Amino acid sequence: MDKTELAAYACAVRALSRREHCAAELRAKLGQRDYSDEVIATVIARLKTDGYLSEARFAEAFLRMRMQGGEAPWLAAQRARQRGADESALQDALAAAQDDFDALRVCRDLLLRRDPQGLRHENERIWQRQARFLRNKGFDAATILRCLKENLQDDVSIAED
C-alpha cells in the first residue's frame, strides 16, 4: 500500500471505529475526501479481508438501532437500503429481527414514552395525532388501531377506578 492508500485506510478505520458502515457509505465518505476510485476499491477490499468491514454486521446493527428507536422493521430496512446496504445481508438481518419484534408492544411503548401521563385520546385530534405518529414510524393501520383501541379501554377502566 502506498501513502495515499494508507491514509484512506486509516480514514476508513476511524469511521468504522465510531459505528458500522456499509461499503457504499465508506465509498461516499472516502470520495468526499477526493480519493480516487481505484484507491477506494483497494481500501474497501482490504477492509473486508481484514474483517473490519462487514455488510452483515452493518445490517444487523442498523436494524437494531432503528428498531430500538421505535421504527417498524420494514421501514428500518428501507432506510438501510437508501444507505446502500447489501440486500442479501439485509434480508438475513431482517428475518432475524422480525422474529423478536412485537409490533403492538412497541406501539404501546412509543405512546407511553411520548405521553407518560397516560394514553389519553378521548378527543379525536389527539387520537389522530397519535395514529399519525405511529404511522410515521412504519406501523400498519391494523396494529395502530388495535393499540389505540386497547389504550382507550385502559384509560376508561382507569377513569372508572
How would you describe each model-predicted region?
Residues M1-D161:
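An alpha-helical, amphipathic repeat domain used for nucleic-acid recognition
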